[in-house]
Amino acid sequence: MAISWAAATTSKLAYPPHVHFSPSPSSNYLFLKTHKPSATHLSSSFIHPTTILHLAAANTTTRRRSFTVRAARGKFERKKPHVNIGTIGHVDHGKTTLTAALTMALASLGNSAPKKYDEIDAAPEERARGITINTATVEYETENRHYAHVDCPGHADYVKNMITGAAQMDGAILVVSGADGPMPQTKEHILLAKQVGVPNIVVFLNKQDQVDDEELLQLVELEVRELLSKYEFPGDDVPIISGSALLSLEALMANPSIKRGENQWVDKIYELMEAVDDYIPIPQRQTELPFLLAIEDVFTITGRGTVATGRVERGTIRVGETVDIVGVKDTRNTTVTGVEMFQKILDEALAGDNVGLLLRGIQKTDIQRGMVLAKPGTITPHTKFSAIVYVLKKEEGGRHSPFFSGYRPQFYMRTTDVTGKVTEIMNDKDEESKMVMPGDRVKLVVELIVPVACEQGMRFAIREGGKTVGAGVIQSIIE
């Protein structure tokens, strides 16, 4: 079942203890991080950098970061269709190295700004451990498309942050080491991609240079195809390109103007992006529906006001239009005074764009992750709803035991997770039931502890103890 949700780990604002919020990929477009851990400082223009932001992880202490904000460099020209993709896969299989190689290879064609590995893996804690904790975002272009690329963490502690990145992808590049084959997080990321509704996957078999036997690489390819088919992706049809992200990156760093045909490993990167261009379709954006953006992060810019960042889920937004801020607190109204993406000013943000919106008269304390910005009157906050829920089996990574009425897990809805209580359980025939077994499909009535902007047909995930235990869709709003 495809679900859209984002994860939560730690909070930067003084949130109530029952609502948890986590770092966002789209905010990464907005603010350039510096490495001194000090009080937050923002300069006075409203803008967009392209590197990683802050660190927040399930098992780590969040440090204060200082942020600087860069002036917008001109206007964003919408010449090519925009697609959100990202790298997923097991820790140390080469996701961040591949992301760096992609930006450098396309920069050599004049289609992107090159990003070095340590610009993508920028948080000090990440570089110390050599792993990506936050979801980092870069932009690049092929001949046909403009891409926003999210580099997702692979380390088990940080799967929640990976969810945040995956929830906004139109397609993913699954990175698997040809030397090791699929590993535990490879499987978990494929499952999560399915759950959050990532529609298409292209595979990059990395570290080909470390595999002496061609047959071994073919076995790994077969194993990956079987794994994708197991999680209901078309395993037999998925494009699989093998190569070496590290050797291509080294070649590009030695000669940034390298041309196609001059290095076999760099050519593999171009081959991968051709597969992505061909295989991952341009998504149909819901531009005709009323505007809605789920807030992923909030910043204050001295002298200008408060910026909310996130991905436009549907509709369009222009400077001067009014929006409702809905969820968690009382609904209030504000005017959008600026719209930007990738350090460039936009006339209009469309569904699918990751943007920053400057809001008039709003303090940072008035607004937080998990709220939504929406066209006035189109969505309201609720605390009680009925939903059809599929409870994952033990083999799917779910619970090992049943749960009963009164069960209190976390409900992941768009960019928030909030504690909710299961107050009623009904079976397929609408008869009251006492318990729910892993693998059951049931109707539940859920009561949330804070109001959240939700609507009929909205998908959510249920998580408990660091794992996904169920997936559902709201059938009706009760209150």
From Swiss-Prot:
Residues 1-70 form a transit peptide. One of its GO terms (biological process) is mitochondrial translational elongation. Residues 89-96 are annotated as: G1. InterPro entries: EF-Tu_GTP-bd (IPR041709), EF-Tu_GTPase (IPR050055), EFTu-like_2 (IPR004161), EFTU_2 (IPR033720), G_TR_CS (IPR031157), P-loop_NTPase (IPR027417), Small_GTP-bd (IPR005225), T_Tr_GTP-bd_dom (IPR000795). It comes from the Eukaryota. This protein promotes the GTP-dependent binding of aminoacyl-tRNA to the A-site of ribosomes during protein biosynthesis. This is Elongation factor Tu, chloroplastic. The gene is TUFB1.
